[in-house]
Amino acid sequence: MAKNKFNTAWLHDHINDPYVKMAQREGYRARAAYKLKEIDEQDRLIRPGQVIVDLGSVPGSWSQYARNKLAKGAQRDAEREGGIDGTIIALDILPMEPIADVTFIQGDFREDTVLGQLEELVGERQVDLVISDMAPNLSGVAVADAARIEHLCDLALEFSQNHLKQDGALLVKCFHGSGYSQIVEKFKHQFKVVAARKPKASRDKSSETFILGKHLKRPA
């Protein structure tokens, strides 16, 4: 009974969520698009001509937002080819419905074959921005969940170290709680500028926050 009440309450909140309504109205696949939008407007992360990689992209709302931001002229419909000033590459283990002007690679970005596809698309250019809204399946066991979250952040950090240009940026989703301070320290070890962002589009009850790292430190 308690579970049914929880599900009913969640569904009620979801249906009445202004960001859910806005996403439906503006054609975004998830309300998460507005989290990236708010952070981008604050930090001006997405700019014309960039190479952007979206790790764990499914269902695709972050790639949609990035695509719309880079769209040429008045072409802002993410479901229609219109050309963009830049390159967006989305990666996920799960399949993703196509997004106009976004190249999708299905597979594990830790695998050489997937990285090979990415490097072929990027060519001699380095990546300007890595974004990741990845989150593990949470078990409710704090220690186990913290380890899973930290692991995903480690993967994004490693990917950025290998592919990000010197003045590039990495934005990842994290959660306040056990292990959070360790993740921040890892960012500080790798980036000159580190900041935490809690967009208004994040649900009030959620402990999620986003960590932004800018300007890679040169290896010692």
Curated annotation (Swiss-Prot):
It catalyses: uridine(2552) in 23S rRNA + S-adenosyl-L-methionine = 2'-O-methyluridine(2552) in 23S rRNA + S-adenosyl-L-homocysteine + H(+). The active site is at K173. This is Ribosomal RNA large subunit methyltransferase E. Belongs to the class I-like SAM-binding methyltransferase superfamily. RNA methyltransferase RlmE family. Its EC number is 2.1.1.166. It is found in: Cytoplasm. PANTHER family: RIBOSOMAL RNA METHYLTRANSFERASE, RRNA METHYLTRANSFERASE 2, MITOCHONDRIAL. InterPro entries: RNA_methyltr_RlmE (IPR050082), RNA_MeTrfase_FtsJ_dom (IPR002877), rRNA-MeTfrase_E (IPR015507), SAM-dependent_MTases_sf (IPR029063). Disulfide bonds: none annotated. S-adenosyl-L-methionine binds at G60, W62, D92, D108, D133. Its main location: cytoplasm. Gene3D superfamilies: Vaccinia Virus protein VP39. Coiled coil: none annotated. Keywords: Cytoplasm, Methyltransferase, rRNA processing, S-adenosyl-L-methionine, Transferase. GO terms for cellular component: cytoplasm. Specifically methylates the uridine in position 2552 of 23S rRNA at the 2'-O position of the ribose in the fully assembled 50S ribosomal subunit. One of its GO terms (molecular function) is rRNA (uridine-2'-O-)-methyltransferase activity. It comes from the Bacteria.
